[in-house]
């Protein structure tokens, strides 16, 4: 057990306020937040003068140690969570993708992910489970896995990657119906896999083999169409829906439209989409271009990143993730001669907190309180762990970051903590640096050095029926009951 800890002289920032206060931590829990706390002799003291004391970041979208396309992502649960805490993130929600096509059940896939993660994680984590095909037993397994024993309250559905991860519309709709029954959140990757497949075939036939083919096979309208379709299906199922990695203006517009109609829709842009654009796919250096291959691809419109940040400021989009899914240069090079074989994925879990501060707060678009909301507290609310996570308050877990808003750092593969030989944010200078990261009362990162212990992180059960998501569900259900007309024979 870590010794008691007091953070002195800092400015506490929550989503709903900023104030000067000290923070006392004991046994991994915040036990006091008030001015002028006296440090007892056995208490470790951190001076946070001119620093912000913020809730640790929650990254709701990672793929650590994920097998796909015959490869495995380079960040396992140790390296991935080390990178996370080095950047000020104290919890990740990773996607478990059971191998349905080879007969693996949801429960077996869940157990496989737990066996990988539990011995390695150095910060807390939760799981979201992907459903990649519908089987007769799927609904029953969903019910089991949403029990407190398993602690899963969201399921992911892919509208892309035909013949591997993609579900048909009828499968997606059935899955959403089950999610609604279980009070679990449907999370959707929005593309049109069937159209993409045809466009890939056409582009290759025309001699387009490089990474530029990836973005050309996935026009921005495809993400927008799929986002609209996912929202329509969710509304028909009376199921709240969470759109992962919102990359384009059209997708964001579809979310806003459906929210205006009364649907419960959450939009998650990612760090890459808030800082970069799709010009990288046309770089003459093949490997440079391949490093940015992800799906949906980065927007071709250079004004999109700023617009997405403004939509976060306005509450039209709601939280930030990373889709951290790292493949190194050797793995990316497997797609030379055929862009469809380039493994899709990028880094982000270490740099999200600084990138969002730079592009959001330092640029003047959002304030520090909104920053806390979109990097931590909204995720905690959606996944039903607030205020245990996502808040500096008595009784909350001591997941805390001492954040220097005036410090700068230049992102580089030479200094990052990913198991990766490049960084898509290479050379970006960011204001806002996590100087100290505390995970449940344990200092895991301090002034440029990791102090992590593999396995010290904990699996956090994510319980179904989050009030933030489902508080109006029963009323909505009553309004959409089928109507029966009684007729005389």
UniProtKB/Swiss-Prot annotation:
Zn(2+) 1 binds at residues 61, 63, 156, 323. Its EC number is 3.5.2.2. The modification N6-carboxylysine is found at residue 156. Zn(2+) 2 binds at residues 156, 189, 245. It catalyses: 5,6-dihydrouracil + H2O = 3-(carbamoylamino)propanoate + H(+). Its cofactor is Zn(2+). Homotetramer. This is Dihydropyrimidinase 1.
């Amino acid at each position: 057990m870590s010794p008691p800890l007091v953070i002195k002289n800092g400015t506490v920032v929550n989503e709903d306020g900023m104030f000067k206060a000290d923070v006392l931590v004991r046994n991994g829990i915040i036990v006091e937040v008030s001015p002028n706390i006296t440090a007892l002799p056995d208490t470790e003291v951190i001076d946070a003068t001119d620093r912000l004391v913020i809730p640790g970041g929650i990254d709701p979208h990672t793929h650590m140690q994920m097998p796909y396309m015959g490869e495995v992502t380079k960040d396992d649960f140790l390296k991935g969570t080390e990178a996370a805490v080095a950047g000020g993130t104290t919890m990740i929600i990773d996607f478990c993708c059971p191998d349905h096509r080879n007969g693996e059940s949801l429960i077996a896939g869940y157990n496989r992910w737990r066996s990988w993660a539990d011995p390695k994680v150095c910060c807390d984590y939760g799981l979201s489970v992907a459903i990649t095909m519908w089987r007769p037993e799927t609904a029953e397994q969903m019910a089991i896995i949403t029990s407190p024993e398993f602690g899963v309250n969201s399921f992911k559905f892919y509208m892309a990657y035909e013949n591997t991860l993609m579900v048909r519309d009828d499968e997606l709709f059935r899955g959403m119906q089950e999610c609604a029954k279980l009070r679990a959140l449907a999370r959707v990757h929005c593309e049109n896999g069937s159209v993409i497949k045809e466009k890939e075939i056409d582009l290759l036939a025309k001699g387009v083999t490089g990474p530029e083919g990836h973005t050309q096979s996935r026009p921005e309208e495809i993400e927008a169409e799929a986002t609209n379709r996912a929202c329509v299906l969710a509304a028909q199922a009376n199921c709240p829906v969470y759109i992962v990695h919102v990359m384009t203006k059209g997708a964001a517009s579809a979310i806003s439209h459906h929210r205006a109609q009364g649907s419960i829709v959450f939009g998650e842009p990612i760090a890459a989409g808030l800082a970069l654009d799709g010009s990288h796919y046309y770089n003459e250096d093949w490997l440079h271009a391949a490093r940015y291959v992800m799906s949906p691809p980065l927007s071709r419109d250079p004004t999109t990143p700023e617009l997405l940040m403004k939509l976060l400021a306005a509450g039209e989009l709601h939280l930030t993730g990373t889709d951290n899914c790292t493949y190194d240069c050797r793995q990316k090079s497997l797609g030379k001669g055929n862009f469809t074989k380039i493994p899709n994925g990028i880094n982000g879990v270490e740099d999200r907190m600084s990138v969002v501060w730079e592009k959001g707060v330092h640029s003047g678009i959002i304030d520090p309180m909104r920053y806390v909301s979109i990097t931590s507290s909204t995720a905690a609310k959606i996944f039903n762990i607030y205020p245990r996570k996502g808040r500096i308050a008595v009784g909350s877990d001591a997941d805390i970051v001492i954040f220097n808003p005036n410090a700068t750092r230049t992102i580089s593969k030479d200094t990052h903590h990913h198991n990766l030989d490049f960084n898509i944010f290479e050379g970006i200078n960011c204001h806002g640096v996590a100087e100290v990261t505390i995970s449940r009362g344990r200092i895991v990162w301090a002034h440029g050095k990791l102090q992590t212990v593999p396995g010290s992180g904990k699996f956090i059960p994510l319980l179904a029926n989050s009030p933030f998501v489902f508080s109006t569900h029963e009323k909505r259900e009553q309004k959409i009951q089928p109507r029966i007309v009684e007729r005389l024979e």
